[in-house]
């Protein structure tokens, strides 16, 4: 190596060492963690496998509560079922703030029901829960909407005549249509070009959010935002979806009948009108748009991705599929559609769905929280607005609660006599005050879609079960299953 290059490297290393030694200890009484470099934070501890792998390695050294610097900002990690419950449930109000995800912050800006904080969040959450409940209990309940959509899916799958297909698009269609019926007051045909474009944008954006480049962006967003990258494509995609939502809102505004609200949008517009003289109201256009984007995006991608994982697992473990179909045949038969009342009579199927959600581990690092005031937790003082990540994967794979956490096994949710066994560690929707807004709808969707498909079809693959790879395509904010082909053959 050239002497000049060696000299340059030596000077660079020396400069970094001086920076490290001169870097003031600014963590105060934060939990322990790896020493950060100035500006870089703990970038050097970032595993190429992503943030989750990195955090799990650090947990082995520092325990269940530790601090990681994402660039210059300290973030506290919570690992294990008991730790997460102690914070998000035991000190629920203190940990009820929402942190930021840098790659989508330019669009969400702390607006909307998922990323809002303080009184804004409380007002929007109360409104959203009440409105979604009302439109789920009206002339057509959520159950009826899901049953009808499931039958549309059955008709579509019959057209395939058992030929191999990628289920991504169809699973997106059915979950999107449920949230659309509640929020927009309509469902879309599976051939609607605008609908297809939105689903494509959702899929691409969900994958980009979980990419390695988006995880690196969390460390250097203040610098990297000025350069091309996945973050710009994500913003562009989300803006296109927002533009479409804006057209729907304007249509609703033009046809609004105050005496007969049709859906979430109508109800929100009426609330806006009612509070237009209140200059401090949270019911304004920006919160409407971002709430709709949040509900539409989350309601589509989380459910459809779980179904994709579920049926990949059914291909990998055909003996589980056979037992589910046997229970379906015994309890439901073939002459009526599944209903939610069937769930309590089908403990094995219910356990399989729970295990799919646990094993899929769809949101492994959870959405970031933020402490709402100076907070004492396990002897550490977390200053107000400190960001906190509940590592949900560490609960869903907690060996204290699951005998073989890295193995797909429905017995994790069955007791000795075969009845459904609940687990404190089961938190795919998070827990505490920030638990997923659509948890109930999602649970109902998974049961009715899963059982309706297996009531009507056998599933198979051209690959032998042992050759089916479950490795996620991306693992970041979400785990994205690998793409695969599946055959749905009429039973």
Swiss-Prot record:
E.C. number(s) listed in UniProt: 1.14.14.1
Pfam families on file: p450
SS bonds (residue pairs): none
Keyword vocabulary terms for this entry: Endoplasmic reticulum, Heme, Iron, Membrane, Metal-binding, Microsome, Monooxygenase, Oxidoreductase, Phosphoprotein
Localisation per UniProt entry: Endoplasmic reticulum membrane; Microsome membrane
Enzyme class at the top of the EC tree: oxidoreductase
Modification type Phosphoserine: residues: 128
UniProt topology in membrane: Peripheral membrane protein
Residue numbers binding heme: 436
Keyword Iron found: yes
Induction context: By phenobarbital.
Keyword Aminoacyl-tRNA synthetase set for record: no
Name of this chain's protein: Cytochrome P450 2B2
Species name: Rattus norvegicus (Rat)
